[in-house]
């Protein structure tokens, strides 16, 4: 490797913004650039993005970050891509023009298609072979919808004139001027079209959904040189890493070993546990998905999502007006020794794993005349930790692995009260890294390893530093008593919106 190749760039294409982050050889951030883009809601429950706007924002932040840092393309060793998963783009092979907006992972328009597939008895097949639940969340039914609803699309697809990709595939196609049509196993495993056991596109699912194989990208390892771009002006830069956002965060947290887990605390919480080289089937409603091993090879993970994490704090701020800033919660929660018996179950949109109850609704129980603002704020923070424990307990049950420590990232990890309570509630150390940009770091690591910028995953271990480790301090009796109260509160919230 030439001595002047001093940096790796991660392109982090998210649900609301596109970012570019430059890392040096010590995994320090040298520069960042970010641009938001438009969310389109054409009907209730529908969510779309303009693929050309995604490309424009992602391309411009890359150019911007080089300009801001004064770096030349010759100094960039490689580019890694991490992306919002499941979001679906279909475009014309000849022109590179999308035939419809990108259908976003949050979009519910294909729920009826999923119900039809369930009626045809496909639920068990999907679970067993793709690791997923039959839901509108995943890409497969979104592709079918586009082929069924865009005029002439199905005919063009059958003639080999259309291409499909998740956002990673779309970006690589654009960056290589249409030369490379590729994805990685982590993104492929979120399409409902990929067999996670055989590690290839699943012909039965393609047949059931009427999707020709010719539309699909080639699946290549998450750490490999896929092609080159001249977007930075000047020399060709290798595009050498791809991973879906949550798997990228797992890799960025160096969760390479079986049983290692991370929790990303954002609007919701995403928990992933590496289960090693064999897929583990969940009996608790968790997803089985592809993760990445230390050499970029396929590993597997269990994944569970908590719908309301940071969103619960936003509710305290925006609707109840109990706080002015999310950062205030640490202060108010620490002013009282406990919640005075108050539990908040933030089932505002139902409950996710392991309950899967769309009819659950937000509930506050245990209120007495002595309950005050501090107790309610504390109960809201505690609810994030309780829900995370629900998922982690399910993971430990499914995998038979006792968690040694939980690595954490995302905005809410700055809240010391929440991190300590999380550790207490799970009776497990919680490890907060110094650098919390772990999603982008994962993509940078994958790209850097592919081109020899970093020699091995062992070298990456030296780049990982811990800001603080939270050690459990709560007694066994106290923890059990509090968690039992939470379970009772959850029961009160369940099936609330069901029609009598």
UniProtKB/Swiss-Prot annotation:
| PROSITE patterns reported in the protein's UniProt record | FGGY_KINASES_1, FGGY_KINASES_2
Q: Name one GO molecular function term.
A: glycerol kinase activity
Activity regulation, per record: Inhibited by fructose 1,6-bisphosphate (FBP).
What EC designation does it have? 2.7.1.30
- Give the reactions, separated by semicolons, that this protein catalyses: glycerol + ATP = sn-glycerol 3-phosphate + ADP + H(+)
What pathway does this protein act in? Polyol metabolism; glycerol degradation via glycerol kinase pathway; sn-glycerol 3-phosphate from glycerol: step 1/1
Instruction: Give the residues annotated as coiled coil.
Output: none
Question: Which top EC class applies here?
Answer: transferase
User: Residues that bind glycerol, according to the entry?
Assistant: 85-86, 137, 245-246
Q: What is this protein called?
A: Glycerol kinase
Organism of origin is Aeromonas salmonicida (strain A449)
Traced from the root, the source organism's taxonomic lineage reads: Bacteria, Pseudomonadati, Pseudomonadota, Gammaproteobacteria, Aeromonadales
Q: What is the gene called?
A: glpK
């Amino acid at each position: 490797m030439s001595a002047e190749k001093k940096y790796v760039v991660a392109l982090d294409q998210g649900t609301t913004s596109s970012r570019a982050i430059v890392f040096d050889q010590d995994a320090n951030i040298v520069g960042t650039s970010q641009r938001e883009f438009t969310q389109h809601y054409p009907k209730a429950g529908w969510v779309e993005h303009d693929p050309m706007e995604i490309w424009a924002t992602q391309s411009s932040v890359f150019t911007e970050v080089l300009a801001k840092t004064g770096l030349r393309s010759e100094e960039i060793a490689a580019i890694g891509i991490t992306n919002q998963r499941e979001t679906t783009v279909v475009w014309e092979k000849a022109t590179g023009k999308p035939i419809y907006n990108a259908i976003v992972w949050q979009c519910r328009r294909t729920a009826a298609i999923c119900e039809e597939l369930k009626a045809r008895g496909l639920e068990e097949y999907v679970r067993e072979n793709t690791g997923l639940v039959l839901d509108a969340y995943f890409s497969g039914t979104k592709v079918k919808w586009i082929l069924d609803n865009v005029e002439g699309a199905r005919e063009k697809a059958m003639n080999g004139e259309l291409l499909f990709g998740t956002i990673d595939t779309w970006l690589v196609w654009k960056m290589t001027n249409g030369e490379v049509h590729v994805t990685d196993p982590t993104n492929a495993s979120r399409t409902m079209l990929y067999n996670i056991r055989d590690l290839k596109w699943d012909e039965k699912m393609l047949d059931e959904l009427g999707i020709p194989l010719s539309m699909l990208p080639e699946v290549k390892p998450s750490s490999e040189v896929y092609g080159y771009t001249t977007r930075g002006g000047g020399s060709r830069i290798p595009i050498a890493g791809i991973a879906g956002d949550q798997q990228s965060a797992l890799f960025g947290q160096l969760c390479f070993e079986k049983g290692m887990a991370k929790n990303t605390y954002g609007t919701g919480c995403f928990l992933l546990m590496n289960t090693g080289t064999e897929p583990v089937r969940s009996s608790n409603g968790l997803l089985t998905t592809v993760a990445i091993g230390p050499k970029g090879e396929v590993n597997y993970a269990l994944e569970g999502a908590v719908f309301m994490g940071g969103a619960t704090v936003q509710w305290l701020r925006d609707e109840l007006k109990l706080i002015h800033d999310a950062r205030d919660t640490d202060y108010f929660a620490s002013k009282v020794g406990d919640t005075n018996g108050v539990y908040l179950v933030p089932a505002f949109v139902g409950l996710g794993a392991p309950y899967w109850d769309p009819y659950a609704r937000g509930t506050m129980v245990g209120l007495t005349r002595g309950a005050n603002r501090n107790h309610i704020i504390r109960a809201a923070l505690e609810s994030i930790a309780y829900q995370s424990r629900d998922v982690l307990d399910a993971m430990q049950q499914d995998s038979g692995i006792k968690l040694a420590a939980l690595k954490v990232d995302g905005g809410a990890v700055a809240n010391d009260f929440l991190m300590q309570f999380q550790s207490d509630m799970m009776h497990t150390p919680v490890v907060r890294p110094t650098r919390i940009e772990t999603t982008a770091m994962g993509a940078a690591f994958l790209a850097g390893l592919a081109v020899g910028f970093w020699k091995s995953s062992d070298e990456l271990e030296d780049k990982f530093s811990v800001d603080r480790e939270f050690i459990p301090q709560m007694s066994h009796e106290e923890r059990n008593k509090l968690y039992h109260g939470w379970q009772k509160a959850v029961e009160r919230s369940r099936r609330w919106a069901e029609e009598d």
